[in-house]
């Protein structure tokens, strides 16, 4: 089976490096599926999920805060601010961040940075969705 190398990296560390048969991410204009021999491409990614299907058929879910996706003939590179594997998400901590962001947005005054609260809310929601997908997949 044909594969393409996939690298998911942040400024701090390499999050994933390996061979993939398919990489799915959400671009600004919708969902993208990148398979081997895909045409070169560069696009911005929305906060959301990235799913990497490895050469052995395993599906790896990542929650990302947004970023850039670049496709070259032999490699897909995803540059992100933050990314978390679904299995590494601490649900209680993420729920606390989400609730705090919702509270700040509901009671906003002059001191609340609305953009930052919305960013936190989006990031927490994406992480919780990735965790839920992981749980559903484990049940099957």
UniProtKB/Swiss-Prot annotation:
For this protein, the record's InterPro entries field holds: ATP_F1_dsu/esu_C_sf, ATP_synth_F1_dsu/esu, ATP_synth_F1_dsu/esu_N, ATP_synth_F1_esu_C, ATPsynth_dsu/esu_N
Read off the Pfam families from this record.
Answer: ATP-synt_DE, ATP-synt_DE_N
MF terms in GO: ATP binding; proton-transporting ATP synthase activity, rotational mechanism
Question: What keyword terms does UniProt attach to this protein?
Answer: ATP synthesis, Cell inner membrane, Cell membrane, CF(1), Hydrogen ion transport, Ion transport, Membrane, Transport
GO CC terms of this entry: plasma membrane; proton-transporting ATP synthase complex
- Looking at the keywords, is tRNA processing present? no
Q: Which Gene3D superfamilies match?
A: ATP synthase delta/epsilon subunit, C-terminal domain, F0F1 ATP synthase delta/epsilon subunit, N-terminal
Extract the coiled-coil ranges from the record: none
The UniProt entry, under SUPFAM superfamilies, shows: Epsilon subunit of F1F0-ATP synthase C-terminal domain, Epsilon subunit of F1F0-ATP synthase N-terminal domain
The membrane topology term of the UniProt record is:
Peripheral membrane protein
Source superkingdom: Bacteria
Location in or out of the cell: Cell inner membrane
The free-text function statement in the UniProt record for this protein reads: Produces ATP from ADP in the presence of a proton gradient across the membrane.
Family under the similarity heading: Belongs to the ATPase epsilon chain family.
Quote the subunit structure annotation. F-type ATPases have 2 components, CF(1) - the catalytic core - and CF(0) - the membrane proton channel. CF(1) has five subunits: alpha(3), beta(3), gamma(1), delta(1), epsilon(1). CF(0) has three main subunits: a, b and c.
Question: Can you name this protein?
Answer: ATP synthase epsilon chain
Organism this protein belongs to: Xanthomonas oryzae pv. oryzae (strain MAFF 311018)
Upper lineage is: Bacteria, Pseudomonadati, Pseudomonadota, Gammaproteobacteria, Lysobacterales
């Amino acid at each position: 089976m044909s594969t393409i190398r996939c690298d998911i990296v942040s400024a701090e560390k390499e999050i994933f490096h390996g061979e993939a048969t398919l990489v799915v991410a959400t671009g600004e204009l919708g969902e993208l599926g990148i398979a081997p021999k895909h045409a070169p491409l560069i696009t911005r990614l929305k906060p959301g999920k990235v799913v990497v299907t490895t050469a052995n058929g395993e599906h790896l879910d990542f929650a990302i805060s947004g970023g850039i996706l670049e496709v070259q003939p032999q490699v897909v590179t995803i540059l992100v601010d933050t990314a978390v594997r679904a299995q590494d998400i601490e649900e209680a901590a993420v729920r606390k961040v989400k609730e705090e962001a919702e509270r700040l947005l509901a009671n906003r005054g002059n001191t609340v940075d609305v953009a930052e609260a919305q960013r936190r809310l989006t990031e927490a929601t994406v992480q919780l969705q990735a965790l839920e997908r992981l749980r559903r997949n484990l049940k099957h």
